[in-house]
Design a protein with these regions (language model features):
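A conserved active-site cap/scaffold subdomain adjacent to cofactor or substrate pockets
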Residues: 25, 29-32, 38-56, 185
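Generic long, charged, amphipathic alpha-helical segments
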Residues: 254-325
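Substrate-binding beta-hairpin/strand module that engages nucleic acids
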Residues: 273, 306-319, 328-330, 338-365
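Single conserved hydrophobic/aromatic residue that forms the stacking wall/gate
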Residues: 375-384
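Catalytic nucleotidyl-transfer cores of nucleotide-processing enzymes
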Residues: 184-186, 192-193, 197-257
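A glycine-rich phosphate-binding loop feature that marks nucleotide/adenosyl-phosphate handling sites
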Residues: 64-79, 91-98, 153-160, 220-231, ...
Length: 384
């Protein structure tokens, strides 16, 4: 952009050192675009048009545009995920205020520590969610960091609960009212001192229940934009603030005065396109002001020397007048996987990689010739 190229579009092969998942491969194809003099709305509109045309011409499916937009905070509060599957309900409900003074120590201690108590009301699913099935859901919750899973089943035979015996009659009534609980419902409750744990556990439980009970329509294509991601996230491991996406995303102008005083509340001009619970693509408006970039790097703990050493070329480029610019990239393989309604990205890649990033069919990565050592490429150890 600084060099005078107003915009570009590329299909790029990428390799990332990331964990293998059903929708992720270490080597993949990316559809990437960057444009000068655009706003968030411009980027979204262009990519909605691209997706609409692809789905119409390839699948004969008419995708409705513009896509729904949802702030990150709303996505987490309602779905427990920053890439929510909106083809079904089972939305999260915050019952922290109802149970703030609860006699149940698990709830009370979580709230006192600054956390929350939230639940999913699996309406009409008491028949499907037996005690045995709920035990399986406990394991799901623990996998995502929760210490356990509290539940209440309301059936024609009465109410069975793992925790309501610790509540007063008033608290029980208030909880049932807040949750909209009726006969046939199951309340799945998670409490923790960390809201991130509550969201992760309930988000996973929501998907597990939907898959178990057949609540997902496989023929639906539900698109939405998740916007206003936090610029910073705090790393307990490193004891410092880190960039949630990358340090070159432009923060919202109205949040700039909070960068030093309240970094956790700073929102980024970042956006993800989500389809049926999968991130289809993502992007952002980039920083083009050297003063703003300097502030963000300092807030991330970069000394002036380290910032210069790591990003000096970028800071120098800014001095020549970088235009406002932004863009977005799609995962091409993932898009094909979702369009074909496949559960694994391996189904749409000719030679997918295995867990250690090797490819058994061709035996790659292969050994290299000795002469490559002259350009500092060493001979690797075969992964298998």
């Amino acid at each position: 952009m600084v060099g005078g190229i107003e915009r570009y579009y590329q299909i790029a092969r990428c390799f990332r050192d990331e964990d293998l998942r059903a929708d992720r491969q270490p080597e993949f194809t990316q559809i990437d675009m960057e444009m000068s003099f655009v706003t968030e709305d411009d980027v979204m509109a262009m990519n909605e048009g691209l997706v609409k045309r692809v789905f119409r011409e390839v699948l004969g499916v008419d995708v409705e545009t513009p896509f729904r937009r949802m702030p990150y905070s709303e996505a987490m509060a309602r779905y427990g995920s920053d890439k929510p599957d909106t083809r079904f309900g089972l939305e999260l409900q915050d019952v922290t205020d109802v149970l703030r003074e609860s006699g149940f120590a698990v709830f009370k201690s979580a709230v006192e520590a600054g956390g929350s108590v939230r639940l999913i009301n699996a309406k009409g699913l008491a028949g499907a969610l037996t005690r045995k099935e709920i035990d399986k859901l406990v394991d799901v919750a623990k996998t995502y960091g929760a210490k356990g899973l509290a539940y209440t089943r309301l059936t024609a035979d009465g109410v069975t609960s793992s925790f309501e015996k610790f509540l007063s009659e008033e608290e029980k009534a208030a909880l049932h009212k807040a949750a909209g609980a009726e006969t046939g419902d199951v309340l799945l409750v998670v409490a923790d001192a960390k809201n991130s744990t509550v969201f992760a556990a309930l988000g996973a439980l929501r998907l597990a229940v939907a898959n178990k009970c057949g609540l997902i329509d496989p023929d639906k294509f539900n698109f939405l934009w998740v916007t206003d991601f936090p610029f910073f996230e705090y790393s307990e491991e490193e004891g410092r603030w880190m960039a949630m996406h990358h340090p070159f995303t432009m923060p919202r102008a109205e949040d700039l005065d909070k960068v030093e005083s309240d970094p956790g509340s700073v929102r980024a001009l970042a956006y993800d396109m989500v389809l049926n619970g999968c991130e289809l693509g993502g992007g952002s408006i980039r920083i083009n002001d050297p003063a703003v970039q300097d502030r963000m790097l300092k807030a991330l703990g970069f000394s002036e020397e380290r910032a210069r050493e790591s990003f000096g070329f970028l800071m120098d480029a800014y001095q020549y007048g970088a235009p406002p610019h932004g863009g977005m990239a799609f995962g091409f393989d993932r898009m094909v996987m979702l369009m074909l309604k496949r559960d694994s990205i391996r189904d749409v890649i000719a030679f997918p990689k295995v867990q250690n990033a090797g490819e058994p069919m061709s035996g790659c990565p292969e050994t290299v010739e000795e002469k490559l050592s002259l350009i500092h490429i060493s001979e690797p150890t075969r992964p298998y």
